[in-house]
Structures are given as structure tokens and as C-alpha cells.
Amino acid sequence: MADKADQSSYLIKFISTAPVAATIWLIITAGILIEFNRFFPDLLFHPLP
């Protein structure tokens, strides 16, 4: 079993990398949606008949 120092370093590493990874993922997703909407307008919204 890992000692306390290893566990706290893993926690600090997770806390510092999780927001960075989430931010990068959201920026990429937003970019894909923006470019899709630029090349194919009106395909992201389908009004009800």
C-alpha cells in the first residue's frame, strides 16, 4: 500500500491536471461545434413540425 506522501502527491497531481484536461476538452468540443455550424448552418437545430 502506498504511504501518505505518495497518496498526497497523487492527489495534487490529479487536482492540477483534471481542470486542465477538462478545459482543453471543452475548448476542442466548442471549436468542433462552432466550425460545424459555420460550414453547415441550421443543421444543429431542427425545429418541431
Curated annotation (Swiss-Prot):
GO terms for biological process: photosynthesis. NCBIfam families: PRK02733.1. The chain crosses the membrane at residues 14-34. Belongs to the PsaJ family. SUPFAM superfamilies: Subunit IX of photosystem I reaction centre, PsaJ (SSF81544). May help in the organization of the PsaE and PsaF subunits. Keywords: Membrane, Photosynthesis, Photosystem I, Thylakoid, Transmembrane, Transmembrane helix. The keyword RNA-binding does not apply. The keyword Transmembrane helix applies. GO terms for cellular component: photosystem I; plasma membrane-derived thylakoid membrane. Pfam families: PSI_PsaJ. HAMAP family: PSI_PsaJ (MF_00522). PANTHER family: PHOTOSYSTEM I REACTION CENTER SUBUNIT IX, PTHR36082. It is a single-pass membrane protein. This is Photosystem I reaction center subunit IX. It is found in: Cellular thylakoid membrane.
